[in-house]
Amino acid sequence: MGLKIHRPRRGSMAYYPRKRASDIVPRIRNWPVIDLGKPTLLGFVGYKAGMVHVTVVDDRKTSPFFGKELVKAVTVVETPPLYVVGLRAYAINPLKAELVSVGEAWVNIPNEVRKYIARRIPTLPEKFDTDKALADLQGLLDSVSYIKVIAMTQPYKAGVGKKTPEVLEIPVGGVPTIDEQFKYASGLLGKEVKPTDVFKPGQLVDVIGVTKGKGTQGVIKRFGVKELPRWHKHRKGSRRTGTVGPKPAVMYTQPRMGQMGFHRRTEYNKRILKISDNGSEITPKGGFKHYGIVRSGYMLIEGSTPGVVKRLIAFRYPIRPPFNYDLKQVQAPSVTWVSVMGVSGVS
């Protein structure tokens, strides 16, 4: 007879509840603690443009293909620079074990940038006393646990066809002392941050995004339940479960129809193959399908990433890297060829 496999569903219970994400901009709940010897932002964001394939020299010394060219599928993520509009300091409330904002400082935003961020924050004041706010924060650093910059995306510099930016907080890390983090964040106020200021080619990152939405789906597509034979004893349907159990208590483990897709998901330890400021070198003939032209810088991420094109994807330093991974000894891979074949097949 052999082993009888009991598989009531193919969907993992680790992803419950399977409901729609609260926001299309992914929220990052945890950040790693890293030591680089210099301060840096712990994350970055970009817009998914599409996928291409490249040839890259395998640099894994334990691989049987070491030193040989491999064909890999990669995701092109357009990364227009972030504009830092402020910083915020947080302290830990010992009674509730939660972060509490103790102060913030905003920069006087120039008019060419203000007209865009006003779409997201209509009540933004005209002027800020940045020096006074920074001086007040300087006196509170003894009680501060985290320093985060307030950054806005610049989609009007990308090919996504939108002008309203997203405003998000990105913590500062890389050094253990708050004084160094505060000094670094203060120096970023009113400046642009590029992906090369945060990451470097060859390193691993965690990719956080909202997956492609598929609406309401049945148990066959949603959980991979085995379809029943179509004969007279299954007159109540074949694309359904045989039984949901006795009433009135139906177990939450029972596969049911419902929302599929548009979930916030994290993919760990994706490798950055390339970072460049020249988007024209990666744009296929005729542009990316449903996206267009990469107008600013871009990153090549090995493999696939969650979400559809034009969707915002967040990157952070790896929170659970391999045991033999050293951030200080990252080597850039050798990308020898990139496919820029257009949709029509014309290269």
Curated annotation (Swiss-Prot):
InterPro entries per record: L3_arc_euk (IPR045077), Ribosomal_L3_dom_3_arc_sf (IPR044892), Ribosomal_uL3 (IPR000597), Ribosomal_uL3_arc (IPR019928), Ribosomal_uL3_CS (IPR019926), Transl_B-barrel_sf (IPR009000)
Q: How does it assemble?
A: Part of the 50S ribosomal subunit. Forms a cluster with proteins L14 and L24e.
Its biological purpose: One of the primary rRNA binding proteins, it binds directly near the 3'-end of the 23S rRNA, where it nucleates assembly of the 50S subunit.
Q: Per the UniProt entry, what species is this protein from, by scientific name?
A: Caldivirga maquilingensis (strain ATCC 700844 / DSM 13496 / JCM 10307 / IC-167)
Q: Which family does it belong to?
A: Belongs to the universal ribosomal protein uL3 family.
One GO term under biological process is: translation
From the Swiss-Prot or TrEMBL record, give the protein name: Large ribosomal subunit protein uL3
Q: Which gene encodes it?
A: rpl3
Q: Which HAMAP family match?
A: Ribosomal_uL3_A
Offer an example of a GO molecular function term for this protein: rRNA binding
* Cross-referenced PROSITE patterns: RIBOSOMAL_L3
What are the UniProt keywords, alphabetically? Ribonucleoprotein, Ribosomal protein, RNA-binding, rRNA-binding
Q: Its GO CC terms?
A: cytosolic large ribosomal subunit
Which range is the signal sequence, renumbered to this chain? Answer: none
Q: Is Disulfide bond among the key words of this record?
A: no
Q: What Pfam families has UniProt attached to this entry?
A: Ribosomal_L3
